[in-house]
Amino acid sequence: MQASLRFYRDLLGMEVWADFKDDTPMVQNVTGVPGANVWMIKLKAADGVSIELLQYLSHPQPIPDPRRACDVGCNHIALQVDDLDALHENLLAEGIEFNVPPTVSSEGFAKVTYCRDPEGVLVELVEIIE
């Protein structure tokens, strides 16, 4: 959890707006995980996009093998950023690996690149070109 928090908060600049643990019947019913005790950290970006980091304290699991962009199911998240080139350089300096440097999309309206968060989630970073 700490590595993911550092990635999203410290490196991508998202703001923590909630940090709590929940083992109530509500969370167990909603998630469908009996006995769930979940540590949740909710973050938001400047544009209002919100993500939740979840760690099931009651059901520890190893980090799965990284999914590929072409695998079926939810495989990546996309976050809009203001200065992709600068962010790319900062993340490289922190040891984050990318598939390619920021690249203009085929439609020409955005620069994009992919990296992985500390748990292997594909993160697409997008800068809209004005």
Regions flagged by a language model, labelled:
Residues 1-48, 86, 93:
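Core segments of cupin and vicinal oxygen chelate
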Residues 24, 58, 106, 129-130:
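A short acidic/small-residue loop/turn micro-motif
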Residues 54, 126-129:
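Anionic group-transfer/hydrolysis microenvironments
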Residues 21, 81, 127:
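Residues that line or immediately flank small-molecule/substrate-binding pockets and catalytic motifs
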Residues 1-2, 45-49, 55-122:
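Vicinal oxygen chelate
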Residues 19, 53-54:
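Short, conserved beta-strand edge motifs with alternating hydrophobic and charged residues
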